[in-house]
Amino acid sequence: MSYYEDILKAKNGQVLFLLGNEAIARGAIESGLSMAASYPGTPSSEVGDLFYAIHEKAKMHFEYSVNEKVALEVAFASSTLGLRSMVFMKHVGMNVASDAMMSIAYTGTRGGLVIMTADDPSLHSSQNEQDNRHYADLSHLPLIEPTTPQEAKDFITLAFDISEKYSIPVIFRTTTMISHERGLVQVSPRMDQKRMSNFESGKDMFNSLPQFASRNKKVLQEKIANIKALESDRFISVERADEDEWGAISSGVGYAYLHDVIAKYKLSISVLKIGMSNPLPEKSILKFVREHPRIIIVEELDPYLEEKIRALCELENVDSIIYGKMNSYFPNDYEFNMDIVRSGVFKAMGKEDPNSFTKGVESPLVAPRTPVLCSGCPHRASFFAVRRALKLAGMEDAKISSDIGCYSLGAYEPFDIGDYMISMGSSIGIASGIPGSASKRTVTFIGDSTFFHSGIPGLINAKMNNAQTTLIILDNRVTAMTGQQPNPGSRDLDDLDSKQNISIENVVRGTGIDSVVTVDPFNLGKMLHAVTESFKTDGPAVIISRRECAILRDAKEKKAGRHVVYTVNTEKCSGCDKCVEDFACPAISIVGGKASIDPDQCDGCGVCSQRYVCPFQAIEVA
């Protein structure tokens, strides 16, 4: 059996060592999950990886949808038929899905519907670190936050139970450290999946016309009030200290750091851990703060709990002193660690930080390392050709907008590709709106998966308004950055020529754009020609730069027993450094004044052997 099959088939009581995301997937399967949908995004991707691998054996439907909004709509539709359904995404994906989510909150559901958001404090792989707990307030939906992989598995089942009992979607929030930490998880029996029920007709069921939505708003508020009255012990735990002066309230991964600080330094602090952050368990909180005159609140990102607890104490005339983010005991940005939590706790308690003597003298032990594209990455060839074309056309100052994906790394030297990079699909709209773009041409980069996700409306807008931009769609045949997931253009990764795959060329031509060419970026001459010609176009021109992701290609080459490596003919090499300075492949370096290729890193793409990279053609097959 495969690793994922082991997770699926684990028996009741068996203990597994799982990622938080894997525990969530196992918990969903235990809950009788029938349908799941997602658009991949770190740090949520491993949930989809597991479902993609085992969905047939689990007798459930799983799909990678074109974007998060569609994924939620698909899962919602299944839930209206009584099936337990789930959608999951990274935190910024909630922005995309929120349009549908706000209305679905009003209509409610029938089968359980869980909406998982994986937040990314410290922006490990994201363009912001928004705190999606606020979506619970905005949508009036329950919010559940686990602390450990075991809780992640157990709480997902509770989320389905609450959703189904109250006919309401439930938001399930993790963070990077919860999703990607490993821990021991004891599994439970798998529930039988519910059978599809007949759809109950009636426009007032799942219709958001104002006359129905106005009634549903009151129903939604009643649901939240009923859940609030529940205050389930499953989501609340209290750890009592010997003394009553100090108490702490925490949730999510913040609790884990707090627990370790208290244990390591033997602090006398009672702790209230909250697993459901909306609706807030006000009775339990009031009881706790009244028992402790001094309260420390530990939570990552925004003072979400703190603001509510302060307001509650003010309303109920509780005079406990609160120490948190709002009075600068803890930072408002980035993820926490044990040092940050220890520092805040000791500051609140008026104790000397035991590690304060090291502050100001710490220095990085490793030299800064700029992220780079993989050896053999087709994006490197595309960037190289575009930079050369811009130079030849005297357009080196042209504005370049980029998008979300591996190719975002083009912003680093030597390519400097990406004056703008904002959000999924934004590159085309931005390029169309750059001042002067009506007369001076811009260049736009977007990946294949991102193009399908949200780039098409921008392209239609560019055509409608005759934007003077060259759009380069970097089609590496896979959603690469999040872990090699398929997308509409590569539904079958084993057969990239399958008729099931949606043609980017046909989509682009369907907008009315005539200037559409497809080029292999490894052929630098043809790529350079295509880009140069596109600059002569009136209106938008599209170049589809198509070549498999190096990781995807390498897996196939390894399976076939093929591997080509290039080397440098030192007699031909002039030591000009152009292959390193301009092409920036991590396999190439300068050793003893000559170029040198590391055979362990060389991918065998051969692009560096072309005269555009090495004018002396000193790079040859080993």
Give the positions of each predicted feature.
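Short helix-loop-beta junction
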Residues: 50-57, 259-271, 506-512
